[in-house]
């Protein structure tokens, strides 16, 4: 797919790699050079409440950096066509700060993720990331607490109404 002799597929993969390289450097200004801020939307499953725009995506990664300041992404596999990039990556880091309210454990982690990225006119316009969040939480907080941490993480993503349903009237009462 990416190495079929056409410039556009390599360009799409290069745009994505450039974006990830900027994120690895914690340079969101440089990362913005690889996205179309007006059209960009991202769903980082488990970390954002569905699709968010570029400003909210930047805030989300800043929150992650507070908990995992040495966050680093490796991209061992990337496939691309004219406008889509699919990537399998590995993220590593150490929980030395608060991560979404959870305390620092000073434990490291290595977890896999998959990215689906759409590129238009040399800029990223959409990104969907699915990370192995359960593995991350277990490595950071241990088996039992990792599951609790994962539950708490997803709990905060639920809309307030879903977390506090209105009691139903008792029939015949």
Predicted regions and their residues:
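C-terminal and inter-domain tail/linker signature
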Residues: 1-173
């Amino acid at each position: 797919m990416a190495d079929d002799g056409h410039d556009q597929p390599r360009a799409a993969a290069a745009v994505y790699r450039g974006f990830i390289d900027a994120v690895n450097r914690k340079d969101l200004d440089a990362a913005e050079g690889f996205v179309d801020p007006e059209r960009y939307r991202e769903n980082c499953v488990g970390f954002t409440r569905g699709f968010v725009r570029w400003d909210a995506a930047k805030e989300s990664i800043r929150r992650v950096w507070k908990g995992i300041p040495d966050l680093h992404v490796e991209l061992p596999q990337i496939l691309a066509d004219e406008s889509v990039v699919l990537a399998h990556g590995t993220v590593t880091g150490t929980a030395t700060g608060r991560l979404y309210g959870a305390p620092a454990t000073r434990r490291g982690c290595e977890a896999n993720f998959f990215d689906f990225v759409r590129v238009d006119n040399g800029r990223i316009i959409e990104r969907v990331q699915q990370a192995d969040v359960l593995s991350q939480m277990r490595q950071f907080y241990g088996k039992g607490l990792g599951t609790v941490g994962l539950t708490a993480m997803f709990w905060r993503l639920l809309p307030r109404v879903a977390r506090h349903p209105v009691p139903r009237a008792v029939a015949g009462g």
